[in-house]
Structure formats: structure tokens, C-alpha cells
Amino acid sequence: MALKYPGGKEYRGNRLNAARQPMAADYANRGMTLEEDLNATNEYYRERGIAVVYKKPTPVQIVRVDYPKRSAAVIKEAYFRQASTTDYNGVYRGKYIDFEAKETKNKTAFPLKNFHAHQIRHMEQVMAHGGICFAILRFSVLNETYLLDAFHLIARWNEQEAGGRKSIPKREIEQYGHYIPLGYQPRIDYISVVEKVYFTV
């Protein structure tokens, strides 16, 4: 199926190939993508009344569908209706939370090309209205996941826009971000980090 942006440009997503090699570090979580881990984590939070967080659906306009059989419709062409914002949003302890989740195979830095200008602007707007906003970043080869406050991400994005570095060094993410250990249930307990960073005085 061909997905296209409103201007007609073809979408080539930055999702990892489904046939990728499994992660080597943790046998229980081997082969899971960041999105799958977060979806399972958010389901765990909802079932236990900890937080209500969902992945936002991407609005798509279906243009052409083939019907070889009535029960086997195949979408052949579709367009994104509008640029999406961030991946996840919800409520924790009465506060709105909004975040983007990205992963990279790079071991030493996180490429800023994984983000888009409209996502950064959205994060700025969420912060301006008092929401909690951050990015969950995974170094998939190292099987390490971090929570980085949107303030640091936006600062790096603005530096890049002014001609600066096009990635965030891993050592900087380790310094300003917060490591999220992988577990069984929940898989990525980012709410524990949110509690420490945004609610503990």
C-alpha cells in the first residue's frame, strides 16, 4: 500500500524493518520494538489504574481500494490527512502527559532526523500549557532506553536548525536523560521515571 502526505509526497516511514535481527541483551524482550513494548506497558498501566495513556492513531484518507473478493479488500493508495503530532498522550496523577517514542541502531548518538519540525512545535505548545512532555529514546543495538525531557530535545533541535550538530550524543542523553530499565511487567516502566522527575520535590 502506498501512503502519501497531503502534498502527494510518498511516505517512506522510519520504522525498523519487521525482519530485523532480534536484540541480543534481554532474552524475554528480544525482538520487541519500542512501540510494542510501550503499548504493552500502557495496557498494564490502564488495567491497574496507574495511568491512562494511548498511542494516537495517524489520520489516513483512503483513496483507492481493490476488491478481489468481498471479504478481501486491499488498500492500494492512501494519504496522511495531516502531519501527526507525537506518538502517545494521556493522563497521570491529574497531569496531561505527551511524548514521542523513537529508536535508533546508532550506538553513540541519537539522530535528530528521526524527529520532525511539527512534532517539536507540538512539544513546545504542550509545555507552554503546563503539560508534561518528553521523548522516550531507545538505542536498539545496546537495548538501552531513556526518557529525555522535551526541554533538552527542543534545545538540541534549535541548535541543529541554526547549523549545529544533527544528533544528540549518547553521553548527553545519559547526563540529562533518565535510564529506564527493561522489565517484565511493565516492560518499560516510564511512569516510575515520570514520578521521580516531575512529581518528586
Curated annotation (Swiss-Prot):
<dbReference type="GO" id="GO:0004519">
    <property type="term" value="F:endonuclease activity"/>
</dbReference>
<keyword id="KW-0227">DNA damage</keyword>
<dbReference type="InterPro" id="IPR011856">
    <property type="entry name" value="tRNA_endonuc-like_dom_sf"/>
</dbReference>
<keyword id="KW-0233">DNA recombination</keyword>
<dbReference type="GO" id="GO:0007059">
    <property type="term" value="P:chromosome segregation"/>
</dbReference>
<dbReference type="GO" id="GO:0006310">
    <property type="term" value="P:DNA recombination"/>
</dbReference>
<dbReference type="GO" id="GO:0005737">
    <property type="term" value="C:cytoplasm"/>
</dbReference>
<protein>
    <recommendedName>
        <fullName>Holliday junction resolvase RecU</fullName>
        <ecNumber>3.1.21.10</ecNumber>
    </recommendedName>
</protein>
<keyword id="KW-0540">Nuclease</keyword>
<dbReference type="GO" id="GO:0006281">
    <property type="term" value="P:DNA repair"/>
</dbReference>
<feature type="site" description="Transition state stabilizer">
    <location>
        <position position="102"/>
    </location>
</feature>
<comment type="similarity">
    <text>Belongs to the RecU family.</text>
</comment>
<feature type="binding site">
    <location>
        <position position="119"/>
    </location>
    <ligand>
        <name>Mg(2+)</name>
    </ligand>
</feature>
<keyword id="KW-0378">Hydrolase</keyword>
<dbReference type="GO" id="GO:0003676">
    <property type="term" value="F:nucleic acid binding"/>
</dbReference>
<keyword id="KW-0460">Magnesium</keyword>
<feature type="binding site">
    <location>
        <position position="87"/>
    </location>
    <ligand>
        <name>Mg(2+)</name>
    </ligand>
</feature>
<feature type="binding site">
    <location>
        <position position="85"/>
    </location>
    <ligand>
        <name>Mg(2+)</name>
    </ligand>
</feature>
<dbReference type="InterPro" id="IPR004612">
    <property type="entry name" value="Resolv_RecU"/>
</dbReference>
<comment type="function">
    <text>Endonuclease that resolves Holliday junction intermediates in genetic recombination. Cleaves mobile four-strand junctions by introducing symmetrical nicks in paired strands. Promotes annealing of linear ssDNA with homologous dsDNA. Required for DNA repair, homologous recombination and chromosome segregation.</text>
</comment>
<keyword id="KW-0963">Cytoplasm</keyword>
<keyword id="KW-0234">DNA repair</keyword>
<keyword id="KW-0255">Endonuclease</keyword>
<dbReference type="InterPro" id="IPR011335">
    <property type="entry name" value="Restrct_endonuc-II-like"/>
</dbReference>
<dbReference type="Pfam" id="PF03838">
    <property type="entry name" value="RecU"/>
</dbReference>
<dbReference type="GO" id="GO:0000287">
    <property type="term" value="F:magnesium ion binding"/>
</dbReference>
<feature type="binding site">
    <location>
        <position position="100"/>
    </location>
    <ligand>
        <name>Mg(2+)</name>
    </ligand>
</feature>
<keyword id="KW-0479">Metal-binding</keyword>
